Amino acid sequence: MQEIIGTLLLMAVNFSQYDMPEQHPLIEAVNHQQLIDTLCEGKECNALAYYDDKKNTIFYDDKLTKDSMIAQGYIVHEMVHFLQYQHDAVIEEPDCKQRMLLEREAYQVQQRFLRSHHIMTYDVDMAIRLLSGVCSR
């Protein structure tokens, strides 16, 4: 993925409201168990990537390959979170609705990216729909 990080960042910028930042995030492949431990408290889950704003790093499942447009879509999604932090769109201690707005934006950019490559976006479409009910629980 390292060799296409600039291209994926450019795609995230093109499909979002953000300007190109001066710096790029770091990107690091990790095993799936590390994602589970970090994001899901050690319980099996479908986590594939996340952006760590403290380390300025996108961590992604080492099974994702640069040749997969779906995998690239996950990285573009996380690039949006990087851009949100770079442009101060994330407030300190956001509430549920604010977090879901940020997440929706990342999914919408991922959706645009995939559609631009003529890839069906059923999973992303479903995630966007589900976000609207998360904070009402």
How would you name each of these model-derived features?
Residues 94-129:
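Post-HExxH zinc-binding segment in Zn-dependent metallohydrolases
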Residues 1-58, 63-64, 68, 115:
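Auxiliary, metal-adjacent structural segments of Zn-dependent hydrolase domains
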Residues 61-65, 92-99:
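Second-shell loop/turn segments in exported
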Residues 1, 72, 76, 102:
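Hydrophobic (often cysteine-bearing) scaffold residues that line and stabilize catalytic clefts
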